[in-house]
Amino acid sequence: MTNTRKSHPLIKIVNHSFIDLPAPSNISAWWNFGSLLGVCLGLQILTGLFLAMHYTADTTTAFSSVTHICRDVNYGWLIRYMHANGASMFFIFLYFHIGRGIYYGSYTFMNTWNIGVLLLFAVMATAFMGYVLPWGQMSFWGATVITNLLSAIPYIGPTLVEWIWGGFSVDKATLTRFFAFHFILPFIITAMVMIHLLFLHETGSNNPSGMNSDSDKIPFHPYYTIKDILGILFMMITLMSLVMFTPDLLGDPDNYTPANPLNTPPHIKPEWYFLFAYAILRSIPNKLGGVLALVLSILILMLFPILHSSKQRSMSFRPLSQCLMWMLVANLLILTWIGGQPVEHPFITIGQLASVTYFFIILILMPSTALMENKLLKW
């Protein structure tokens, strides 16, 4: 009699994905972030579901309902802060996961990579709409500023913005639809994650050497299940420390003031995980140019497989490319810092330089350095 795990139509799929999956024997902790992102997504859906039970998507009561969750609902404060800080953890892991993909050349799995970039866009859209829901000052003005960017689209722009708003400004209709989209998108993301995994399992995982590992595979369970559990443990310790001790560390104090269309906050800025893109947007003095740069700063990830000019897949044995990779990381940290600063000298100039450098490293320096490394190795 065959094992149920291997014969049952549904359990068989789980078995091939998480139990008997052949995995490279040398994948490092950088490969933990996929499972951590999965746990984050599950946690966000779960906490979000409980928040939605008590939240009201109406301009007059939204802010009060969030206050009610924190004050009156059993462990409401815990659920709310786990959801808010869980989003921050989600983005930290996303950026590590993408960075890992760039460093080790995982982007050569074209299908997996492209669906991953689409996933990034979907998660960013979800996070943005979630930030609008508490209906604080930064929620309202963030929504106003970001949706207004669409007015830069030639010809259809202004009509498009009013269509998204459901009126002539960000109001009740906007909040209601943002709540609807914020609720449905995580489930669409879950479906996309399944496609992401489907494409990954077609090829098998990459590994730090960037070489074919078919000759040395080990079963996913117990080796990588236990490794993932350790990663999840570290994640939960970090998340719960953040939630219990400094829940508002990554938030904006302005969002504790109810939304007021008649009073603009002195510095409108998004959550920390969007600051690098916001800095790129602000560094261009033209509205349409800024919007294009903003979209391209993420969409540029799609170009990595095309721009790959090295004969080696991974950066493990390419010191010059490694230097550029860490330059890119430093550059993104500078952009994140600039995105949170007011628009004045010297921040404007630093932001413009960092924005140009970002595109220059990816589009010119990385491919040309890879070609130079090929030459140095006489390939």
Curated annotation (Swiss-Prot):
**Binding-site positions, heme b b562:** 83, 182
In which compartments does the protein localize? Mitochondrion inner membrane
Recorded GO molecular functions are: metal ion binding; ubiquinol-cytochrome-c reductase activity
| CDD domains associated with the record | cytochrome_b_C, Cytochrome_b_N
Q: Which note does the record give on the cofactor?
A: Binds 2 heme b groups non-covalently.
InterPro entries hit by this protein: Cyt_b/b6_C, Cyt_b/b6_C_sf, Cyt_b/b6_N, Cytb/b6-like_sf, Cytochrome_b, Cytochrome_b_C_euk/bac, Cytochrome_b_N_euk/bac, Di-haem_cyt_TM
Disulfide-linked positions? none
Q: Where are the transmembrane segments?
A: 33-53, 77-98, 113-133, 178-198, 226-246, 288-308, 320-340, 347-367
One example of a Gene Ontology biological process annotation:
mitochondrial electron transport, ubiquinol to cytochrome c
- Positions of a ubiquinone binding: 201
- State the family it belongs to: Belongs to the cytochrome b family.
Q: Could you tell me what this protein does?
A: Component of the ubiquinol-cytochrome c reductase complex (complex III or cytochrome b-c1 complex) that is part of the mitochondrial respiratory chain. The b-c1 complex mediates electron transfer from ubiquinol to cytochrome c. Contributes to the generation of a proton gradient across the mitochondrial membrane that is then used for ATP synthesis.
Instruction: Tell me what this protein is called.
Output: Cytochrome b
Native source organism of the sequence: Ctenomys australis
